[in-house]
Amino acid sequence: MAAKSFDVVVIGAGPGGYVAAIRAAQLGLSTAIVEREHMGGICLNWGCIPTKAMLRSSEVFHLMHRAEEFGLKATGVDYDLDAVVKRSRAVAKQLSSGVSHLVKKNKIAAVMGEAIIPAKGKVKVTTDKGIEELTAKSIVLATGARARELPGLE
């Protein structure tokens, strides 16, 4: 299979990567984005956004217990942790779908898989369907970061 050629290939579709890809496309550059898991990255899918959705549920729960301060009555106030988690996942999924929509709207080629850079200007992506080869004048690394694991904190 022949390599697909682009002006820019962005590796990583988190908040840095998808914004870089969208801007490149808006500037008229042929652009591809490679993501190994979910559009939007860790923050959108597993960290910041779902956590804030769960915190909002907690805030509402707290406010409901203070209803009488506002001249309201709320009896039998309780929570369902499974439903709270389900809502947080739904919020993340909706926003991830929004990122996918922006990628598509800006005519960015999205490739789901794990990327390596075997040579200058070349990106090899292992997808569910095999190996996909891309070439690019520029490659943007937007793979995010992971916290260092400290010995003894297992």
In which residue ranges do the predicted regions lie?
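Glycine-rich Rossmann-fold phosphate-binding loop(s) that bind the pyrophosphate
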Residues: G12-P15, R36-E37
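Residues forming the Rossmann-fold NAD(P)(H) cofactor-binding site
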Residues: Y18
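Glycine-rich flavin
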Residues: A2-F6, I22-L29, V34-E154
